[in-house]
Amino acid sequence: ALWMLPFNTRFQTSDNVYYNELQANGLYKFYEAFLKNELDYMQFYRTLPEDRAAALVHDEYRSEGQNHRYITSPNEERHPNIVLVTLESMSASFMARYGSSDGLTPRLDSLCGKALVFDRLFATGNRTVRGLEAVTLSLPPCPGQSIIKRPRNAGMHSTGAMLRDKGYDVLYFYGGNSYFDNMETFFGGNGYEIVDQKQYAPDEITFQNIWGVSDEDSYAKAIRTLGQRARSGRPFFAHIMSVSNHRPYTYPAGRIPIPNDAKSRAGGVMYSDYALGGFLDAASREPWFGNTVFVITADHCASSAGKTEIPLEKYHIPAMIYAPAFVAPGSVGKTASQIDLMPTLFSLLGMDY
C-alpha cells in the first residue's frame, strides 16, 4: 500500500496540531519523509521569474554604497567582562514572576529585582541549536537546518568574533561533549575556546549523567577558568550552556527538596535554578565580579507543542541583564527575541559593531 503515501496527506485536516502530528507519526509519513529528504525552498520563499531575479542581483552588485550596517554608539565604549548563560529548557512559565506558584525558581525570581528584565522575550525555536544560533549570530532562524549544524559555518560575524576583535578572550563552556549538535565545529571555527567535558580532570567531576557533568561542576569549572583569565588583564567573554534540566532529570543528591531519583521535570528546573544561584554567589566572591555583566536567558522552552501552530506561551523564555556596576535594574515590556539580546547589551555598553 506504499503507493498510497501521497494520498495519506489528506487526513491532516484537524485544527489541533497534536492530532495532525499523531496521525503523521507512522509508516506512511516515515517513508514519504525518507523519499523527500530535501529542503523544498518553494515552501519557504516567494520566488520571482529568473530574468527579474537576475536583474535585481545585477543591480545589487553594481551598488556603490555599503550593503551592511555599522552601528556606532554615541556613548563611551566600555569593555567589562561578559558572561552569557543559556539555561537548558527554561520556560518563563516556571517562574513566579510569570504566574507560577510552584516555587521552582527562587534564585531567578529574586534576581529579577536586581537586573534589567525583558518580560516579553521569545525563543526563535524549540531546539538548543536554534537558541545558540540566535544569541551567537543575532540572526532569525533560517529554513531547514540551523547554521550551527551546517557545513561551511566558520568565520562568521558572531558575538564572539566581534568581542575578540575588541581584545576579549572568548570561551564556550559546555558540560557535555561539544561534538553534540556540531557545537565543537561551529564554536571552534568561530574563534571560541571550547571548555567541555573532555577538559575536566576526574576530581573536577562530582556528578554526571548521559548529558554530561552537573551544572554545579560546569559552573565551578567556569569560576576556576575565568579567575585565571582575569589575572591576564584582558576582558573575557564566556558563554555557558547548562545541561542538567534535561531528561532524565538527574542531579546531585541533597541539593533541593525534590529527591534526585524522582527524575521529574520540576526537579530539573529547580536544580538548574539552584546551580545558577550557586554560580552567581561564587562569582560575587571573585575579584572580577564588579567588572562583569551577566546575561541570563534560555535556549528554548521545556516544550513547544500545543493546539495551535505556534503556541506563543511555549516560546516565552526568561531574559535579563545583571550588572550592578553597569546596568540599572528595571523591566522592558516590549516584545523581543533572542536575536535582540546581544545587540541590546552592546548598546548599553556603548559598543560599536
Locations of the language-model features?
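N-terminal secretory/membrane-targeting segments
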Residues: 1-80, 112
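Solvent-exposed soluble domains appended to multi-pass membrane proteins
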Residues: 58-353
